[in-house]
């Protein structure tokens, strides 16, 4: 693992990179750990805002997962939180090896302006995205279906563009890997 705050600290590598981001406490660390079958590759926490740097993880010497700080509520000083925006924007807009961004959202919450602005920003910079709804196991099948539809409408996307995921049951894990594979092929 390597951590960075500015481009001169980024690892020198030609490996394709997939960045992971989302609101604080949406299950980003659990998603990454589940994808690589490791419980503690990325530290999980119930305290929002634990990820404060850009963290690079090389996976099987073939791909790099990049863990970005979460946006929204975080128990960190305002000065730290304000530095995340430029740090993340610099990474996303300048990294040649970046193949796409996984935007992680909690299925129990309708996305807000931050998620909508982030998706718009990704479109502006022509950065492909994968949209994941985590914590799907926390809802009944009926509520899952209703939230899936409501979130698709809120984001103005088709339901098929939203992958339902559960770190607990591993639901959606293969779909996430398939989507990552499609991004890397470009």
Residue ranges, per PLM feature:
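Conserved G1/Walker A P-loop phosphate-binding module
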Residues: 1-75, 185-186
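Conserved C-terminal guanine-recognition region of P-loop GTPase G domains, centered on the G4
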Residues: 86-160
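Structured catalytic cores of enzymes that bind and process phosphorylated ligands/cofactors
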Residues: 20-27, 32, 62, 100, ...
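Switch II of P-loop NTPase G domains
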Residues: 10-13, 47-55, 69-99, 107-121
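Short, glycine/charged-enriched secondary-structure capping and boundary segments
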Residues: 14-15, 35, 78-81, 116-120, ...
